[in-house]
Design a protein with these regions (language model features):
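Intrinsically disordered, charged low-complexity linkers and terminal tails
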Residues: 1-166
């Protein structure tokens, strides 16, 4: 899947979203370390995007959602707030989920909320895809781990490229 360019689709989904969260996938996220962690660890900053507010630190919270991934793969996944750890994790991606492999370590995870119950996610692997995506929204690698609102629009030079590729 790394040979396909999903950048234009990720830019389009982000531009239609209310909020987007980006992060570089860690070795724990992709299973490279062989640890027991399940799913993708997300920043606490994404809690309002998922739950509407930051959960009370002493209360576990779950939210079931459907995510459409690149290649139109759909998952019925769960966001779980672990109060004891102060962690938010995306789990229940399903057996054989094609995108969280060790070779995806360092890839850019793009997670967008398109409407109240519609989410999209992309894994951008190549340096060119990652750079083009970040540039489209005036972001840099230092902005990973944050949520943003794309209401400022696309950079003009990438807007045309996204329309052509779509």
């Amino acid at each position: 899947m790394a040979d396909q360019n999903f950048c234009a689709a990720a830019i389009d989904a982000t531009s239609r979203s209310t909020n987007t969260y980006i992060k570089f996938l860690s070795a724990n996220d992709t299973g490279l370390t062989g640890g027991h962690q399940s799913g993708v660890l997300l920043s606490k900053k994404t809690c309002p995007m998922i739950f509407g507010e930051l959960p009370d630190e002493h209360v576990a919270k779950r939210e079931n959602i459907r995510i459409t991934w690149q290649d139109d793969v759909k998952t019925d996944s769960t966001f779980t707030w672990y109060e004891s750890k102060g962690e938010l994790r995306l789990t229940r991606l399903g057996r054989g989920f094609p995108y969280l492999k060790p070779e995806e370590t360092g890839a850019l995870f793009v997670f967008s909320r398109l409407s109240e119950d519609e989410y999209s996610a992309y894994i951008l692997v190549s340096e060119i895809e990652i750079e083009d995506y970040l540039t489209a929204f005036g972001l840099g690698p230092q902005d990973a781990g944050n949520m943003f609102s794309p209401s400022a629009g696309l950079a003009p030079e990438l807007d045309e490229a996204a329309e052509i590729a779509a």
